[in-house]
Amino acid sequence: YKSTEIKSIKYYDSKSKEWIKFVPLMAQKSLPSVWNKNPKPYKTPIFLKPVYEGKNVSAYIHYISTITNTKTLHLEGTNYVFYFKVKNEDVAKGYWMGSSIGAKMLLKIVFKPYPVMKETVSNLDTKEFYKDPISLIRTFDSLLK
């Protein structure tokens, strides 16, 4: 199947004994940075796992894997990128990837187009954010009208 042809895809996780749903959405290719404040989206929708559905904003997780090969080294890793999508916008925006270094600076860049989040991000308790990154999107949802 192509991501442009289906509304969702589910698979059964035998470890958790649960069905896991993924939805295709247009999403940014990378997290924003000081050099690229608004990353371009992928050319086609990618599959994201919904983790929060609010009135104004939804949150998603994108599972990723990386492989790096050199002459003397082979590294493999898995991680995830947290995304949010405002209801009236076309592209999901990445807001966090699990790194504790520079998280608040990144969030200030991500949420700059949303003035309602300025105070929340400035006063963010990063330790609490690391424990539950989706809590920030729940707050964002409650602040949007």
Where are these regions (language model features)?
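Aromatic-patch recognition
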Residues: Y1-T120
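C-terminal partner/receptor-binding element of secreted or periplasmic proteins
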Residues: Y114-K145
